Design a protein with these regions (language model features):
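Nucleic acid-contacting regions in RNA/DNA-associated proteins
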Residues: 52
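Glycine-rich beta->alpha junctions and the first turn(s) of the following alpha-helix
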Residues: 1-10
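Glycine-rich phosphate/cofactor-binding loops in nucleotide/flavin-utilizing enzymes
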Residues: 61-104
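C-terminal helix-coil-helix/basic helical segment that borders enzyme active sites and/or dimer interfaces
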Residues: 10-42, 55-58, 62-63
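Short, hydrophobic/aliphatic alpha-helical segments
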Residues: 43-48, 73
Length: 104
């Protein structure tokens, strides 16, 4: 599980740093809506995976108030309720892909 957790963290890190680098490019900045939404989706869902696996490793003690994992669990779940929602991100990506296919 620890290797899987590290992999998920690396995926999230590379995604967010990649989008941040694109965002710093003034010419591309205005065209990054999908990329930013992908980053939010990826980072939130990878964080959920990591916290869930960490809690599985620790067991029931991970739910105790004194354990920071219970707070991390709540904090990362909050990302699911902040826009854009996962289903809207996926729908927008599909719409963009269809538009690009019909242009060509």
């Amino acid at each position: 599980l620890i290797g899987e957790m590290d992999l998920a963290l690396a995926q999230a890190r590379f995604t967010i740093y990649g989008v941040a680098e694109l965002y710093n490019d003034q010419e591309k900045k205005s065209d990054l809506v999908n990329e930013i939404n992908i980053a939010k989706h990826t980072v939130t869902n990878r964080a959920l995976e990591v916290v869930d696996k960490a809690m599985r490793l620790v067991g029931a003690k991970s739910l105790q108030r004194s354990n920071p994992l219970q707070r991390y669990y709540r904090d990362v779940r909050a990302g699911l309720h902040n826009p854009p929602m996962d289903d809207l991100t996926i729908k927008k990506l599909a719409e963009t892909a269809i538009q690009q296919m019909t242009k060509n």
